[in-house]
């Protein structure tokens, strides 16, 4: 997709792709070898407000009821299947770096958002190396 050096890589934040209607899994596949950091942050898109305002909503981030989309704690915007697909794809593209929780959820305290994000990610992250494929 583009030329890059070993010292230059992507800080992948799926939340921005989600509000734009893009597929973060497809983006991860395209960026194989260029992802150097991963942010665990989610977005909830409100279909009614999106139909009215579009995705380039310039309203206040504090206007949670009327915005087309809002940042959410992981698991409160997108379903578990998307997060499992992202974690699996990170493994397939060879990413072995950190998963950094970024809390920008206007509905939860930082403490509660962090606690919920940790619990959610514990279920979807792949932390052990796979066994040899004896069936292949």
Feature locations, PLM:
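A structural motif corresponding to the C-terminal end of an alpha-helix
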Residues: 4-5, 85-96, 128
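Residue-level marker of alpha-helix boundaries and capping positions
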Residues: 76-77, 108
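A general structural detector for well-ordered alpha-helical segments in enzyme core domains, enriched
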Residues: 1, 27, 82-89, 116-121
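Soluble or luminal CAZymes and related metallo-dependent hydrolases
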Residues: 20, 78-82, 113
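A short, acidic, flexible beta-alpha connecting loop/helix-capping segment that sits on the rim
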Residues: 100-109
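C-terminal helical cap(s) of enzyme catalytic domains, especially alpha/beta-barrels
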Residues: 110-130
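Acidic/histidine-rich catalytic cores of soluble enzymes
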Residues: 1-74, 131-135
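Conserved, mostly hydrophobic/aromatic
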Residues: 13, 38, 90, 99, ...
């Amino acid at each position: 997709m583009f030329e890059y050096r070993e010292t230059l890589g992507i800080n992948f934040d799926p939340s921005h792709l989600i509000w734009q209607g893009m597929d973060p899994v497809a983006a991860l596949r395209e960026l194989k070898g260029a992802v150097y950091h991963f942010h665990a942050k989610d977005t909830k898109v409100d279909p009614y407000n999106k139909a009215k305002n579009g995705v380039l909503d310039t309203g206040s981030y504090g206007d949670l009821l009327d915005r087309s989309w809002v940042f959410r704690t992981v698991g409160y915007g997108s379903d578990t299947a998307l997060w499992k697909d992202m974690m699996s794809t990170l493994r397939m593209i060879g990413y072995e770096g950190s998963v950094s929780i970024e809390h920008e959820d206007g509905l939860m305290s930082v403490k509660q958002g962090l606690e919920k994000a940790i619990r959610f990610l514990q279920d979807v992250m792949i932390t052990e190396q796979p066994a040899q494929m004896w069936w292949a």
